[in-house]
Amino acid sequence: MADRYINPKVTTVSTGIPGRHIWSARHNHVVIDDSAAHDGPGDAPGAGELFLAGITGCATLMMERLARSSKAPLKRVEVSMEGLIDTEAKREGPAVFESARLKFVMVGVNDTQAREMVETYKRR
C-alpha cells in the first residue's frame, strides 16, 4: 500500500550565469533559462515551460492510475499544454498565465472512458 503522505522536495540554484539556474530533485538536475527577451540565455526550458510540464506529467500519471484502478485498457496517453502570458500586462509582480489549455490524447480506451477519466482528473 502506498504511503499516505508524500513530500516532494526541489531546489533551484543560480549558476553565476545571468538567467541560468539548476533545478534539482533527488539526484536529477535540469537547467532552467530565462528567455532571451529577459536577457537570459534562452537555450534551456524556462520556468513557465517547466510549470506546464509539471501539470502534464501529473495528468499522464493520473490517467494511468485511473486506467489501472478501473481496468481500462489504456495503452498510451499524451497530454500537451500551452499557456499564454501577456508580458506587457500592467500588474504588480511577475507575469502570470492569462490562459492555459490542456489536450489529452488516449489510445486503447473508448471516447466514454477517456471523457470519464479526464472529468475525474478535473475534479481532483
What are these regions (language model features)?
Residues M1-A53, R65-R124:
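Extended beta-strand/beta-hairpin segments
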Residues C58-A59:
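Alpha-helical metal-binding/catalytic segments enriched in His/Glu/Asp
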